[in-house]
């Protein structure tokens, strides 16, 4: 059997972080078993569905590296097929037309409320003769659900979950305007697409009982199910806007790498021993549905930052440059020159061990391209005492005559200078850092000087000596 999974988002907004995890789990399970991962856009709510939201979902999946098989399928475009199945159930006697008016149904609910009964359709048209239908009323089509026994969901995550059929009413399959309901459309689409495993949030678990009844009415074999607990915020409450970023696009804008997000989302609800760093290839080999936890997982932004720092350190320097250049250019308000690209690439080994996001990386390297004289932050300016400026003057002379302009040679020269003058290395290096970067925090300062080059280094030292 070929494993077929699907991701079926509604295009009413961005790709939610919870949806991204659902897509990842489906993708991993399919790829790990040599199967197919399909994408279906559940766009039957025409009032809320937008092309911009579809584009955002596709873009988010593409950025995460979750490629799908074939073209995305529009649920709305399959409405005729959904109606065909509803009418087939009518012919089989597994469904019926209901002519109850909205006023009748509201009165029914009010009476149930008054008696303290569960509010559900009472089956008033289930066995009535269609000849009794009132004139001029467009009926809905309802499933003739079993009234005895139970419906059982056998779930890879939740275990065996049962409901008494007497607790379920006859759901609407086709509305009076001929449009299908969500529950019908999902079943028909999953069946026609050959979906073998449905992996989705556990907020869909109650829908599954009704969907299984549709499968049974049509004589179709249902897929296997895995209902995954939702993601909660750090405080344990259901994830909401107050917890921060909700969309995948926001995490990208905050400077997280796609491989970080894949690893992090994988560990939200699934584990492989104590492993925290799990490559995508390892995830494909190890991931299985039965090891998904049954408790909600919590976002942990500190863990996400640390994980991102790991993947930044592991990344190729040229790739990091390509990712960070647009951010740098936006901050500078101009494009980088070819020589500035080269400078950034040369500086990358010193920068990447010190940051946890691409945003930090972009902000941290701006001093490489700053116009002279550099703007100094308060701590850096405080270091430039008259004594420090005198030291910088001596370093200027020392560096001017240095034959080998490398980080190692610069460091040795400054160490020798500190020893001669009886100063600690930090007493010399920190004012130099302030002069070259405008800050008290930077990559190793001798690497910075090497990347800046002799001319730029000497000019920045000169500016710092003259600073008012």
Swiss-Prot record:
GO function term, MF aspect, one: tRNA binding
Catalytic activity entry: tRNA(Glu) + L-glutamate + ATP = L-glutamyl-tRNA(Glu) + AMP + diphosphate
Protein family according to the UniProt entry: Belongs to the class-I aminoacyl-tRNA synthetase family. Glutamate--tRNA ligase type 1 subfamily.
Gene Ontology biological-process annotations: glutamyl-tRNA aminoacylation
GO cellular component, one term: cytosol
Principal location listed in the UniProt entry: cytoplasm
UniProt lineage: Bacteria, Pseudomonadati, Pseudomonadota, Alphaproteobacteria, Rhodospirillales
InterPro entries: aa-tRNA-synth_I_cd-bd, aa-tRNA-synth_I_codon-bd_sub2, aa-tRNA-synth_I_CS, aa_tRNA-synth_I_cd-bd_sf, Glu-tRNA-ligase_bac/mito, Glu/Gln-tRNA-synth, Glu/Gln-tRNA-synth_Ib_cat-dom, GluQ/Sye
HAMAP family assigned: Glu_tRNA_synth_type1 (MF_00022)
Pfam families the record matches: Anticodon_2, tRNA-synt_1c
UniProt-annotated location(s): Cytoplasm
Short sequence motif named 'HIGH' region, residue ranges: 9-19
Keyword terms: Aminoacyl-tRNA synthetase, ATP-binding, Cytoplasm, Ligase, Nucleotide-binding, Protein biosynthesis
Enzyme Commission number(s): 6.1.1.17
Complex and partners: Monomer.
Binding, ATP: 241
Name of this chain's protein: Glutamate--tRNA ligase 2
Motif ('KMSKS' region): 238-242
Role of this protein: Catalyzes the attachment of glutamate to tRNA(Glu) in a two-step reaction: glutamate is first activated by ATP to form Glu-AMP and then transferred to the acceptor end of tRNA(Glu).
């Amino acid at each position: 059997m070929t494993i077929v999974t699907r991701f079926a988002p509604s295009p009413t907004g961005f790709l939610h972080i919870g949806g991204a995890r659902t897509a990842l789990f489906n993708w991993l399970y399919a790829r790990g078993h040599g199967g197919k991962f399909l994408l279906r856009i559940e766009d039957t709510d025409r009032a809320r569905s937008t092309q911009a939201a579809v584009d955002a979902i596709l873009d988010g999946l593409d950025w995460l590296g979750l490629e799908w098989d074939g073209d995305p399928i529009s649920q709305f475009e399959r409405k005729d097929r959904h109606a065909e199945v509803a009418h087939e159930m009518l012919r089989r006697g597994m469904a019926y037309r209901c002519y109850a008016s909205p006023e009748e149904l509201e009165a029914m609910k009010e009476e149930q409320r008054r008696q303290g009964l569960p509010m559900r359709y009472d089956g008033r048209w289930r066995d009535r003769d269609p000849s009794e239908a009132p004139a001029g009323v467009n009926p809905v089509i309802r499933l003739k659900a079993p009234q005895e026994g139970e419906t059982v969901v056998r779930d890879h995550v939740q275990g065996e979950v049962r409901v008494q059929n007497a607790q379920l009413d006859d759901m609407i399959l086709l509305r009076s305007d001929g449009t299908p309901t969500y529950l019908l459309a999902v079943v028909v689409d999953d069946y026609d697409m050959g979906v073998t495993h449905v992996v989705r949030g556990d907020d869909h678990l109650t829908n599954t009982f009704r969907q299984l009844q549709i499968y049974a009415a049509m004589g179709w074999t249902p897929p296997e199910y895995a209902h995954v607990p939702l993601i909660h915020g750090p405080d344990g409450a259901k994830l909401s806007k107050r917890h921060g970023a909700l969309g995948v696009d926001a995490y990208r804008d905050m400077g997280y790498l796609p491989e970080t997000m894949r690893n992090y989302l994988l560990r939200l609800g699934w584990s492989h021993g104590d492993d925290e760093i799990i490559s995508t290839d390892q995830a494909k080999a190890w991931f299985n549905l039965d090891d998904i936890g049954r408790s909600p997982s919590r976002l942990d932004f500190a863990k996400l930052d640390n994980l991102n720092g790991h993947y930044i350190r592991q990344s190729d320097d040229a790739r990091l440059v390509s990712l960070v250049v647009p951010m740098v250019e936006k901050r500078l308000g101009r494009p980088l020159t070819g020589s500035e690209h080269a400078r950034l690439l040369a500086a990358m080994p010193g920068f990447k061990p010190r940051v946890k996001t691409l945003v930090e990386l972009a902000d941290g390297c701006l001093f490489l391209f700053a116009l002279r004289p550099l703007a100094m932050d308060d701590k850096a300016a405080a270091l430039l005492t008259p004594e420090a400026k005198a030291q910088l003057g001596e370093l200027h002379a020392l560096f001017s005559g240095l034959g080998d302009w490398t980080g190692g040679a610069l460091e040795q020269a400054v160490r020798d200078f500190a020893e001669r003058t009886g100063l600690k290395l930090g007493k010399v290096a920190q004012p130099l850092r302030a002069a070259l970067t405008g800050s008290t925090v930077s990559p190793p300062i001798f690497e910075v000087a090497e990347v800046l080059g002799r001319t730029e280094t000497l000019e920045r030292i000169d500016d710092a000596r003259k600073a008012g």
